Amino acid sequence: MKRNIWGLNLQELETWVVGNGFPRFRAKQLRDYLYKRHIFHFDEMTQFSQKMRDWLKENGQIDKLVIISRAQSDDEKTIKLLLKLKDGSLVETVCMCHHYGNSICVSTQVGCAMGCIFCASTRKGLERNLTAGEILAQMYAFKELYDIPFHSIVLMGAGEPLTNYEEVLHFIHLANDPELLNISYRNITISTCGIVPQIYRLADENIPITLAISLHAPNDRIRNVLVPISKNFRIKDVVSAAEYYFKKTKRRVTFEYILIKDMNASVENAKELCRLIGKMPCHINLIPINGTEHIKLYPPEWKEIKRFQDILLKKGKETTVRKQMGDEIQAACGQLKRRYLNSVT
């Protein structure tokens, strides 16, 4: 069986190349062909002997993603790609252009098992995990089209990153590699629904990445409705895990809180959220819910959003309201889904 070498780091390439009788330095050349020069046909890797090129063709393959479609927001600050994997599965990835640089939102799974009622990505459940190479390839798809640098990565696309732990961690190290994308760990954010054991595990890795927790409620009663997986993890245990993460990494945790009219956006909800978090250093990101096709949930009026934020600010909680980006191309939070399927069925 041929080995897919896309997504292998230098050490893995060295093990493969040297183990098959070729000099170690050839692995570095192979890495550069893949990740720097973007040459994906072995016959074009002319630094190698014919013998090595023949061996690569016989024993290796490079599984690239195929770009099916792309969409761009009216302000040209958000671009979404629909990508096809080798097995025919579809994933979406989004690039957001900010004043400080380009940020990419990547998917970590095909579908999602978390069941959040406001999220389009979970409607058909989880199909499978993505490999580190498939996550990395989402970034290179943008580089191939636009040749743009990336300042930061958010793992906030389809899927729960912490239930694909090993591949996600491998991807993070690849993205950080100075010879690949050279993205600082501090500019990488993992968003999780709150898989408590994995938050502790991630904290113990001692990697200074940012952790964002999709809290969305001030108590278990509301959260169990919005985020069904939370029935396995009490909200106070999620916050305790976040506190451990902060103490271990010295990285402030972000709590994401989707605001939904008549559900979790009242004055009492804001006060209860403050009591839940206590004195823990954190950032609270308020996200007015985006309109979706499959469920009738609506954002509060702006005055209600501002009132909610003001309560948090008066309690000393650093709080912002997320800027909406890409809504008209279905690229905003909670709307990453495979619309392409609707057009071909």
Give the ranges of each region predicted by the language model.
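Auxiliary Fe-S-binding modules of radical SAM enzymes
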Residues: 1-89, 243-251, 257-345
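Glutamine-centric residue-chemistry signal
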Residues: 29, 109, 135-138, 309
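Short linear Ser/Thr-Pro motifs
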Residues: 73, 107-108, 121, 191, ...
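A short loop-to-beta-strand scaffold at the N-terminal edge of the catalytic core in hydrolase folds
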Residues: 90-95
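Canonical Radical SAM [4Fe-4S] cluster-binding loop centered on the CxxxCxxC motif
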Residues: 97-134
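Conserved alpha-helical substructure of the radical SAM core
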Residues: 122-152
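Conserved AdoMet/S-adenosylmethionine-binding subsite of the radical SAM
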Residues: 143-152, 157-315, 319-322
